[in-house]
Every structure is written in C-alpha cells, then in structure tokens.
From Swiss-Prot:
Annotated spans, Disordered: 426-458
Function according to Swiss-Prot or TrEMBL: Tubulin is the major constituent of microtubules, a cylinder consisting of laterally associated linear protofilaments composed of alpha- and beta-tubulin heterodimers. Microtubules grow by the addition of GTP-tubulin dimers to the microtubule end, where a stabilizing cap forms. Below the cap, tubulin dimers are in GDP-bound state, owing to GTPase activity of alpha-tubulin.
UniProt GO BP: microtubule-based process
Database matches in PANTHER family: TUBULIN
Residue numbers binding GTP: Q11, E69, S138, G142, T143, G144, N204, N226
InterPro entries for the chain: Beta-tubulin_BS, Beta_tubulin, Tub_FtsZ_C, Tubulin, Tubulin/FtsZ-like_C, Tubulin/FtsZ_2-layer-sand-dom, Tubulin/FtsZ_GTPase_sf, Tubulin_C
Organism annotation: Pyropia yezoensis
Binding residues for Mg(2+): E69
Protein name: Tubulin beta chain
C-alpha cells in the first residue's frame, strides 16, 4: 500500500499531530489502545496507509514524535490516546530550543537529529511502498521551525524520490507568541522553498476567525483550532485511506497543484463549517460545499484569495457525491469567477471523490488552493524581518549558536524572490506570451532577454 510516515516536531506540531491521530483513528474505528472496534470493512481496507498492523491485531500509527523538551510529549503519552503510539517513536531532548531557530537547526536539534532519523528509517523500512512523508510543525518557534526544517532536509537527502509535504503554522499578524518569529519564519521558508514538495500554510489568526465568526465559539482555545486543521488533513488524505471514484495521492496532488517548482505554498479550507446546533438546518449539496469551500472567510491562512489569482486548486469531496456534479461545479466556479483564475492554465481545478464521509457528516470537502495571494503572508513576515534585521536586533542569540549574518541575508532575499515570482505570474497573461513570440521572431529582443519567465503584457 502507499504508506505515509507522519512526523510531528515541536509543541505546535505535536498538538496538531495528536489531534490528527484522534480524528483519523475514529474514522478507521481504532480505539485509544490501537484495537479495532469499527463496524465496516471499509475502515480497515486501507488503514495501513497510516497504521502499521502489529502483533495481536493492534494498529500502531506510523508517527514519529519529536521535541527538544519532554513536556508536550509526556502530556501526549499520559493523555487518553497515549497508548496508541509506539513508545520508541517518542524522541525528546532535554534542553529545549527556546524559540531560537539556530538552536533547533544547528546545535540542540542537530544533536538529536540522528536518533530521529533512525526512527524514521525504521518506519520507512516497515512500509511496502512508501509514498512520502508529512510533517506538522510551526514556523514561529524554535524546535518546529529549526529542527523541523533540518529533518525535512535530511529526509530529502536520504529519500530524494519520495514526496515531502508539510503542514506549517505561519506566524499570525496580530497574535504573536514570540518577538523573533519573523527571523524563525524567514529562515524556515528559505529551507522549505528548496526541500519540500508541498507546504500547506495555516495560521492561528485565520483559525481564530473561523472559530469565532463561523463556528460561533466565543473563546476559541487551541484544541478547537487543532480540530479544524486535523479536519483538513483528514480530508486531503481521505482518498488514500478509503476507496473512491476519483483517487488521489501525494504525488498526484503535487503534480496538479505545482506549476513551477518553487511555488508550492498552498492555502487550505474545509467545508461544511457551521456552529453547533445549526448543522441540522443546512442543506448539504455539492454546490453548497463548493461555495463555502471557495469562500475567503474559510481559508485557514490569513490572506485573501481575492487579492491574487489562483494558479491551480484541488477539491477533495467525501460522502455520497456524484462525480458528474462535482465536475460541473468545478467548471462552473471557474467560468463564473474567471478573473480569479490565471487564464493560461485551463481546467485549473482538480477534484477527487472518496465514498466514505467523515464521522458525523453526510458529506464534506477539503480545499487546497495555489494562489498568488499567499504572498501577503511572506510580505508581512518579510517587512517585520527587515525592520529588526536592519538594526541587528536579537541577532546575538543566533550568531551565538554559530550562525552567520550572511544566512539571514540569503533567507531574506530567497523569500523576496518568492514574492516577486508570485507577483510576476499573477500579472502574466496569455496575450503577453503571444507578444513575446512575435518579438522573438522579429529578432527585436536584446540578447540578454530571458524567455524562462512569462513576458508581462504592456
């Protein structure tokens, strides 16, 4: 089977990861000790994508739990689902990264990384046909960002032909946990641009807004936010774990969503989202789900897709859904909102359908969009970064761990390049391409004009 090895790093990554395992264990009918208590054969049909069947029929998650301090991992071990995981798969340091990317990437994290890779290797060897890895982490702290990206690059080195997807929690515009978030995030993005195949951008503020405005929770807490994220994670992988009419896997996902290798930062959404008690009053049709799925208020990253254009998008429907209806809706949304889609990629929306709905729903949909509006996040982080870096504020914490200022400059320019690439593709049009060809034929263009990038129409 096409297995996925899951790695969670740092406090945020472990909390999101733990919630994800709760959600999919429930879907597969696996209780907190790993025993199967489900009711349908479909639940076990492809459970081995995420679970290893141990002795005595126990299902053990293919999960590696990593942190540089033992606190969060101890909480997970002692929690109601602690018995689910393989005890050897917990790898904890003692010192913590103290929100310092350099500690996670170069000093403390580097000491621990070999023992983590041993566990990852063992999990990978236990797979028949490993499809790839998924990592949950945040980019604002020390362990998730520093050590998380170190793991991503080491795994990429060792398994160059396997997919690498990350669920990365971006720093929020208004809710900031630490002052050095812009540094940690920029250094991480610099790594993810090079070493990941797909990065799903999540941010706490957007999640707060969804909980507060859509789910009508007056005081959203982290478990509420993590539940939202795990809903999308479960939706994206549903067609790998259950039979469906239009299947998908991590590689298909990347092939359909990434038009240029560096542009693999996606925004994600989920439908249906409705407040408790209102669910019964809402009609659920494919049209409703599509409408909610493409609603900017539904995006789990704080950037408005209306400010940019979609290069590509993917929709994952679950439940008793007609494939024909799904394709009609996808076609309709592109025709109706043609201004929001790039005109030089026709049929930009890929759909997949899985027959098994999530627990407690009749149908649901997860959404992934590759939109040029994601540059808002990078611009915001970049401006905070340059404000601090200009004055060399807080730099001594990083240089003290052996980092060089050059690395900061490189990371900053890599992120700025990413923003300008996104802007360039947003402005490019089909006419621009044709114009370029005419110029080329007429031999008017200077020798140094490059044709790699789309020519921008005047």
């Amino acid at each position: 089977m096409r297995e996925i090895v899951h790695i969670q790093a740092g406090q945020c990554g472990n909390q999101i990861g733990a919630k994800f395992w709760e959600v999919i264990s429930e879907e597969h009918g696996i209780d907190s000790s790993g025993a199967y208590i489900g009711t349908s054969d479909l639940q076990l049909d492809r459970a081995e994508v995420y679970y290893n069947e141990g002795s005595g029929g126990r299902y053990v998650p293919r999960a590696v739990l990593v942190d540089l301090e033992p606190g969060v991992l101890d909480t997970i071990k002692a929690g109601p689902h602690g018995g689910l995981y393989r005890p050897d798969n917990f790898v904890a340091g003692q010192s913590g990264a103290g929100n310092n990317w350099a500690k996670g990437h170069y000093t403390e994290g580097a000491e621990l990384v070999d023992s983590v890779l041993d566990v990852v290797r063992r999990e990978a060897e236990g797979c028949d046909c490993l499809q790839g890895f998924q990592v949950t982490h945040s980019l604002g702290g020390g362990t998730g960002s520093g050590m998380g990206t170190l793991l991503v690059s080491k795994i990429r080195e060792e398994f160059p032909d396997r997919m690498m997807c990350t669920y990365s929690v971006m720093p929020s515009p208004k809710v900031s946990d630490t002052v050095v978030e812009p540094y940690n995030c920029t250094l991480s993005v610099h790594q993810l641009v090079e070493n990941a195949d797909a990065v799903f951008c999540i941010d706490n503020e957007a999640l707060y807004n969804i909980c507060y405005n859509t789910l009508k929770k007056p005081e959203p807490a982290y478990p509420d936010l993590n539940k939202l994220v795990s809903g999308v994670m479960s939706g994206i992988t549903s067609s790998l774990r259950f039979p469906g009419q239009l299947n998908s896997d991590l590689r298909k996902l990347a092939v359909n969503l990434v038009p240029f290798p560096r542009l693999h930062f996606f925004m994600i959404g989920y439908a249906p989202l409705s407040a408790d008690g209102v669910t019964a009053y809402r009609a659920k049709t494919v049209a409703d789900l599509t409408k909610q799925m493409f609603d900017p208020k539904n995006m789990m990253a704080d950037c408005d897709p209306r400010n940019g254009r979609y290069l590509t998008a993917s929709a994952y429907f679950r439940g008793k859904v007609s494939t024909k209806e799904v394709e009609e809706q996808m076609d309709a949304i592109q025709t109706k909102n043609s201004g929001q889609f790039i005109d030089w990629i026709p049929n930009a929306i890929k759909a997949s359908v899985c027959d098994v709905a999530p627990t407690g729903e009749t149908m649901s949909a997860a959404f992934i969009g590759n939109s040029t509006a994601i540059q808002d996040i990078f611009k915001r982080v970049g401006s905070h970064f340059s404000a601090m870096f200009k004055r060399k504020a807080f730099l001594h914490w990083y240089t003290g761990e052996g980092m060089d200022e050059m690395e900061f400059t490189e990371a900053e320019s890599n992120m700025n390049d990413l923003v300008s690439e996104l802007q360039q593709y947003e402005a490019a049009t089909v006419e621009g391409e044709e114009e370029e060809d005419e110029y080329a034929e007429g031999g008017v263009v200077n020798g140094d004009q490059s044709y790699d990038e789309p020519y921008q129409a005047a």
